[in-house]
């Protein structure tokens, strides 16, 4: 029995009965919606047959909060809610803006000093830049709020972002513009070099 498997651990088993609830066509690029999902640049591509969030353009049309999230957020959960994110559970903005605000809320709430971003090339540089801007502002808010409470609040290092770009090799002059347009401070390449040398290349644009 599926439920008993969890209960024997013991783990509370809870099920979502609203199987027809989903992000919706405004949020998700998905072949099932009759849209093309295979852009050559990888930005509007359903990687590994997974739906893709429509976050390529931060200035895209505003979207509303999906119904399943509205239902979830109707019941306050003070033990797990992030207060800094509550103001972004309403209204409308582009998908990229919602995502950037939600992620930056963790920075504002917990004083996170940087992000390591995975599979960077599948999200536009403009959207990454937006995340960098929101996170930088969020960290400044956290530091101002926590002076005298946390030693890190007195740090002056800017918010740091490093990105993983498969088969990137290196780009010391930032010709790819991941630094200038994407807001990244460094990049790492997890491509496996067949020669067995330089397996990981870490470059800092400056």
Sequence positions of predicted segments:
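Active-site-proximal helices and loops of the catalytic beta/alpha 8
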Residues: 3, 19, 101-206
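Low-complexity, polar-biased intrinsically disordered regions enriched in Pro/Ser/Thr/Gly
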Residues: 81-88, 143-149
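Active-site-adjacent bridging/hinge elements
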Residues: 69, 73-77, 99-109
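Core domains of carbohydrate- and sulfate-ester-processing enzymes
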Residues: 2-79, 199-206
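Solvent-exposed, acidic/flexible segments
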Residues: 43-46, 92, 96, 128
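Active-site mouth loops of central-metabolism enzymes
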Residues: 53, 84-97
């Amino acid at each position: 029995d599926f439920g008993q498997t969890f209960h024997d651990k013991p783990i509370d088993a809870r099920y979502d009965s609203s199987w027809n609830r989903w992000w919706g066509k405004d949020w998700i690029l998905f072949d099932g919606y009759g849209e093309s999902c295979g852009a050559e640049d990888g930005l509007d591509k359903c990687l590994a047959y997974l739906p893709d969030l429509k976050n390529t353009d931060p200035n895209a049309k505003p979207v509303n909060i999906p119904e399943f999230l509205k239902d979830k957020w109707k019941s306050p959960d003070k033990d797990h809610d992030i207060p800094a994110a509550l103001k972004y559970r309403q209204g409308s903005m582009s998908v990229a803006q919602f995502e950037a605000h939600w992620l930056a809320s963790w920075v504002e709430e917990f004083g996170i000093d940087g992000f390591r971003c995975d599979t960077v090339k599948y999200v536009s540089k403009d959207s990454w830049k937006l995340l960098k801007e929101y996170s930088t502002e969020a960290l400044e808010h956290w530091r101002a709020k926590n002076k005298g409470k946390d030693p890190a609040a007195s740090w002056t290092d800017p918010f740091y972002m490093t990105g993983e770009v498969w088969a990137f090799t290196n780009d010391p002059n930032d010709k790819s513009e991941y630094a200038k347009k994407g807001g990244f401070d460094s990049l790492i390449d997890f491509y496996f070099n067949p020669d067995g040398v330089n397996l990981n290349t870490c470059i800092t644009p400056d």
